[in-house]
Amino acid sequence: MRDSSTTASTKSSPLWKPFASNCCSVDDQTVFGNLSRCRPSRSEFSKNHLGPLPSFRRLSFADLSRSSSARINEDLAQTLGADLVDFQMCELKMITQSFSGNYLLGEGGFGKVYKGYVDDYLRQSLKAQPVAVKLLDIEGLQGHREWLSEVIFLGQLKHPNLVKLIGYCCEEEERVLIYEFMPRGSLENHLFRRISLSLPWATRLKIAVAAAKGLAFLHDLESPIIYRDFKTSNILLDSDFTAKLSDFGLAKMGPEGSKSHVTTRVMGTYGYAAPEYVSTGHLTTKSDVYSYGVVLLELLTGRRATEKSRPKNQQNIIDWSKPYLTSSRRLRCVMDPRLAGQYSVKAAKDTALLALQCVSPNPKDRPKMLAVVEALESLIHYKDMAVSSGHWPLSPKSQGGKVSPKVRGDHRSGRKSAPGSLRS
């Protein structure tokens, strides 16, 4: 049965709004102009035609004058209406104590993320709540294009498993995004940082289902969206460990009509990107499915997608784990030792087989995300714990005399991982 949260869009009620007629964009294949140098839009972008959501090229900061910033704000306000709050920089400085280090949550390719608090004292009608304030570093890896892409996508998409964008700020060279605050941080931190308690099996499965629902929602839109950077650091967790996808800076509209794929410059994160995308630049929703399979393997094993410090045949999680994924008795040799056998044997095996299908070298052999959701939801209630069914602890024979649970647990050595909610 289809989950209603993953099929929210219908042909009679499309989610996308067209840009205002005086606003333009740049796509990887077709040039329509850009927000700082607007030209009349094409005739097909009429009031009754919902064209594909535009993506935007990086603009030099020298081009982002007062007038261009004002035009961007005007265009976004016309397009998104009251869906997002257009914050002023002085307001953001007020709620972060001028971006004080005491309020710093993390740092990554975009810049720094600070915690703040908004309410109706700051702006009338604002819901009182903590927020995450993401401040663009003008010397960083991401820029205006990614900032604008995120505003456009998250400004129009609403789903329980997508992080909520509350507002933005565009003043001269400053680019800021304001999100709902996710108190549990990123999945990356919970899986790979020693200071975090191990996630129980039921919680891992819950996270896997919720993240799959987020991707399924994007893929099942009338005009599908390819997330393009699915990884543990972009999966954020609320107080109940409900997973939400964040960081839409690399998201892209999928193929339309008779086209089987879109061709684009290869971007994303090494270890998660699908091989056909890396080699050809051909991008489909099945590219996201591959990345999802990698994250499933991380949830099962507690290992990162790539670990250069390991022996060569163990550096890539797929190459290392694949020989163990089709047998329950062999699978236990690569299960996260922090679970200590507290996982369902059947659910773990079925999850491993699903992950193996997701990372198939042939994109056509990978399942759709709606099918992934259905498969994982059927595993939630299994109670055959490995620790009580003879599958744990590992015997020396099952280990082949090579790897002990204690040694395998050392992959979380003191090396500090990058903060969660940002692209590494």
From Swiss-Prot:
Main localization, broad class: membrane
EC number of this enzyme: 2.7.11.1
Modified sites of kind Phosphotyrosine: 179, 277
Catalysis performed (reactions): L-seryl-[protein] + ATP = O-phospho-L-seryl-[protein] + ADP + H(+); L-threonyl-[protein] + ATP = O-phospho-L-threonyl-[protein] + ADP + H(+)
GO MF annotation list: ATP binding; kinase activity; protein serine kinase activity; protein serine/threonine kinase activity
A Pfam family matched in the record: PK_Tyr_Ser-Thr
Gene Ontology CC terms: plasma membrane
Listed SUPFAM superfamilies: Protein kinase-like (PK-like)
Binding-site positions, ATP: 105-113, 134
Modified residues (Phosphoserine): 233
Keywords tagged on the record: ATP-binding, Cell membrane, Kinase, Membrane, Nucleotide-binding, Phosphoprotein, Plant defense, Serine/threonine-protein kinase, Transferase
Entry annotation: catalytic residues: 229 (proton acceptor)
Protein role: May be involved in plant defense signaling.
Similarity comment text for this entry: Belongs to the protein kinase superfamily. Ser/Thr protein kinase family.
Subunit structure: Interacts with the Xanthomonas campestris effector XopAC/AvrAC.
Name under which the protein is recorded: Probable serine/threonine-protein kinase PBL15
Organism: Arabidopsis thaliana
Higher taxonomy: Eukaryota, Viridiplantae, Streptophyta, Embryophyta, Tracheophyta
Gene: PBL15
